[in-house]
């Protein structure tokens, strides 16, 4: 991916606030959230809609969202019909994979300017049944599309939470260690919110209700005042035989939100007199055993950092998606990461995990955090249901 003297750069990055399940953003169609962030990143980059070559978004729970929701989001943002738009599906990694695909398209010369990102409204995900051939007798069971299409491992037919329990057991991550990761995430997110660290990256979403328009611009999911004592009282959710360690508090949530970035070559940014947020140095993806899908970022990060010609010690900040605290602890342990460099403003346990959006959300947060603290090198990475990981290295300056 390293493009030498004319690398692919990111010139703008924004996200919506993250809504709780059935919360502030639950009534907003997913393509409208996509439209909101596309409009914002184009405006920040001073790029006219007709100058865009392509739009690529990660989106996982597409059932009932209408034909090609990314195309709907693109057109809604004023991008003309002549500009193609499409979505990619890599579960939790979708939003970052979309950015990788955009960078590839530009590096290959197929595109000049690409808007990439991700979006998800988990609150609107429907329940499903198959009635195509009719039902002669009896009840018709409904399947939750969040579970069957997003959170259930297709190879072992169990919930992602069980994969976290598998990681906790194999990497010897105790319940207390998981709760400490979760409390740290919540406390960091609380501090970041109160200090205004997310203000620059968030674009408000206008939500219609009987009371009129409401502006949603603050992440809804964090639980301020979180502490170990309260968290320790929760019972394990996925294994209830006395061996479980994963609880609702040390796992990420089900959430709604969208994020986007604008990419172009460095020379194009210079021509437009734009100062890039960062250049994309490398990216990588890897596969692991699906039963321990959460450790996918370990090989992905190692490979991406090696491609960049860096060592792990060279990296100033990591944004690694907190699908589960057990997973976060195992990754940090295996890679020997300094906790002061990882998710310094909290992660998905506190902020939430809108499936298709999270990959780009963590990249947006990484870019703005690097800028705020004066860091140079950053890594964004996610584990992926089904046993995969994806990682990207970016560099400022």
Curated annotation (Swiss-Prot):
A GO molecular function held by the record:
acetyl-CoA C-acetyltransferase activity
Could you say which EC number(s) this protein's record lists?
2.3.1.9
Q: Where is the signal peptide?
A: none
**Which organism was this protein described from?**
Mus musculus (Mouse)
- Alphabetically, which GO biological process terms does the record hold? fatty acid metabolic process; positive regulation of intestinal cholesterol absorption
Q: Per its record, how is this protein called by name?
A: Acetyl-CoA acetyltransferase, cytosolic
PROSITE patterns for the chain:
THIOLASE_2, THIOLASE_3
Q: Which family does it belong to?
A: Belongs to the thiolase-like superfamily. Thiolase family.
For this UniProt record, the keywords arranged alphabetically read as follows:
Acetylation, Acyltransferase, Cytoplasm, Transferase
**Gene Ontology CC:** cytosol; mitochondrion
Its main localization is cytoplasm
Known partners and oligomeric status: Homotetramer.
Q: Which SUPFAM superfamilies does the annotation name? A: Thiolase-like
Catalytic site positions: 92, 383
Q: Cite the NCBIfam families for this sequence.
A: AcCoA-C-Actrans
State what this protein does.
Answer: Involved in the biosynthetic pathway of cholesterol.
Q: Does the keyword Repressor apply?
A: no
Q: Where is this site: Increases nucleophilicity of active site Cys?
A: 353
* Positions annotated to bind CoA: 223, 226, 252
Q: In which pathway does it act?
A: Lipid metabolism; fatty acid metabolism
Q: Which residues are recorded as modified (N-acetylmethionine)?
A: 1
Indicate where the modification N6-acetyllysine is found in the sequence.
Answer: 200, 233, 235
């Amino acid at each position: 991916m390293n493009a030498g003297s004319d690398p692919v750069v990111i010139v703008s990055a924004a996200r919506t606030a993250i809504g709780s399940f059935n919360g502030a953003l639950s009534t907003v169609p997913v393509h409208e959230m996509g439209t909101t962030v596309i409009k914002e990143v184009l405006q920040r980059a001073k790029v006219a809609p007709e100058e865009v070559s392509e739009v690529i978004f990660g989106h996982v729970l597409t059932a009932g969202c209408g034909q090609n929701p990314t195309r709907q989001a693109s057109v809604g943002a004023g991008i003309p019909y002549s500009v193609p738009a499409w979505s990619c599906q890599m579960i939790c990694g979708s939003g970052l994979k979309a950015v990788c695909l955009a960078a590839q398209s530009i590096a290959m010369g197929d595109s000049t300017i690409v808007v990439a990102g991700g979006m998800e409204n988990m609150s609107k995900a429907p329940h499903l049944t198959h009635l195509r051939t009719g039902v002669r007798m009896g009840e018709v069971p409904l399947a939750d599309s969040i579970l069957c299409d997003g959170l259930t491992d297709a190879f072992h037919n169990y919930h992602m939470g069980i994969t976290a329990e598998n990681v906790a057991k194999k990497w010897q991550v105790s319940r207390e260690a998981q709760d400490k990761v979760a409390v740290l995430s919540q406390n960091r997110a609380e501090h970041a919110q109160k200090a205004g660290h997310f203000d620059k990256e968030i674009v408000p979403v206008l939500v219609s209700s009987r009371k009129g328009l409401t502006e949603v611009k603050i992440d809804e999911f964090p639980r301020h005042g979180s502490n170990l004592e309260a968290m320790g009282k929760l019972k394990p959710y996925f294994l209830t035989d006395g061996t479980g360690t994963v609880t609702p508090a040390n796992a990420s949530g089900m959430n709604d939100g969208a994020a986007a970035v604008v990419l172009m070559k460095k020379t194009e940014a210079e021509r437009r007199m734009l100062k890039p947020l960062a250049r994309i140095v490398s990216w990588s993806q890897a596969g692991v055993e699906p039963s321990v899908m959460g450790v996918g970022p370990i090989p992905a990060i190692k490979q991406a950092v090696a491609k960049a010609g860096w060592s792990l010690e060279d990296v100033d900040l990591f944004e690694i998606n907190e699908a589960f605290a057990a997973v976060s602890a195992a990754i940090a342990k295996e890679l020997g990461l300094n906790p002061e460099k990882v998710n310094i403003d909290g992660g998905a346990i506190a902020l939430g995990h809108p499936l298709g959006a999270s990959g780009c959300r963590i990249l947006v947060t990484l870019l703005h955090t690097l800028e705020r603290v004066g860091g140079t090198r950053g890594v964004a990475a996610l584990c992926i249901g089904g046993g995969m990981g994806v990682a990207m290295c970016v560099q400022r300056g």
